[in-house]
Curated annotation (Swiss-Prot):
Belongs to the universal ribosomal protein uS3 family. SUPFAM superfamilies: Prokaryotic type KH domain (KH-domain type II), Ribosomal protein S3 C-terminal domain. Residues 47-118 form the KH type-2 domain. Keywords: Chloroplast, Plastid, Ribonucleoprotein, Ribosomal protein, RNA-binding, rRNA-binding. Part of the 30S ribosomal subunit. The gene is rps3. This is Small ribosomal subunit protein uS3c. It comes from Draba nemorosa. It comes from the Eukaryota. It is found in: Plastid, Chloroplast. Signal peptide: none annotated.
Length: 218
């Protein structure tokens, strides 16, 4: 069971918390979900188009959304917020205007905050972006996976598993390759495991990257 299910949903309420915090009437629940997706897509597109760092990574670990009747509070957890912070007031103001246009919210105030995370390579989203960048630059998949594991070891994690699926290295038959370092106890609910699945488009086609990181045991 623990091998197949999404590790984040499996641990909600124990070691994982929700990234969206709000209440809605059952009839309006789908509208709230759609709004969240628009907010996250808008922020990611803005970061991608305006403040891309040299390695080609967005560096967003997660986006938390808290909604009240008259306020939408968005917290962006970033691994490399340097470029965003250099010109902080203008950047955030521009981002707020973009999100407000996307949502068309008149009666609600929008507030965006940026939080820097320590050990960015201990977060699977940022690590997946790193691997995707390597694969796009035609670096060998084994080399990319080993480098990713080296980076997580510096972030003091207890274990990592990386899986890449698709037409790896341009081979005609799609296959799945994976590597594990340390412990990754997927069946233990008390184990704090971070997970992400990421799609990367290469010249050979689409590849899927999945990363499990064992952070700690509670």
């Amino acid at each position: 069971m623990g091998q197949k299910i999404n590790p984040l949903g499996f641990r909600l309420g124990t070691t994982q918390s929700h990234h969206s915090l709000w209440f809605a009437q059952p009839k309006k629940y789908s509208e709230g979900l759609e709004e969240d997706k628009k907010i996250r897509d808008c922020i990611k597109n803005y970061v991608q188009n305006n403040i891309r760092i040299s390695s080609g990574m967005e560096g967003i670990a997660r986006i938390e959304i808290q909604k009240r009747i008259d306020l939408i509070q968005i917290i962006i957890y970033m691994g490399f917020p340097k470029l965003l912070i250099e010109d902080k007031p203008r950047r955030i103001e521009e981002l707020q205007i973009n999100v407000q246009k996307e949502l068309n919210c008149v009666n609600r105030k929008l507030n965006i905050a940026i939080t820097r995370i320590s050990n960015p390579y201990g977060h699977p989203n940022i690590l997946a972006e790193f691997i995707a960048g390597q694969l796009k630059n035609r670096v060998s998949f084994r080399k990319a996976m080993k480098k990713a594991i080296e980076l997580t070891e510096q972030a003091n994690t207890k274990g990592i598993q990386v899986q890449i699926a698709g037409r790896i290295d341009g081979k005609e038959i799609a296959r799945v390759e994976w590597i594990r370092e340390g412990r990754v106890p997927l069946q233990t609910i008390d184990a704090k495991i971070d997970y992400c699945s990421y799609t990367v488009r290469t010249i050979y086609g689409v590849l899927g990257i999945k990363i499990w990181i064992f952070v700690d045991e509670e």
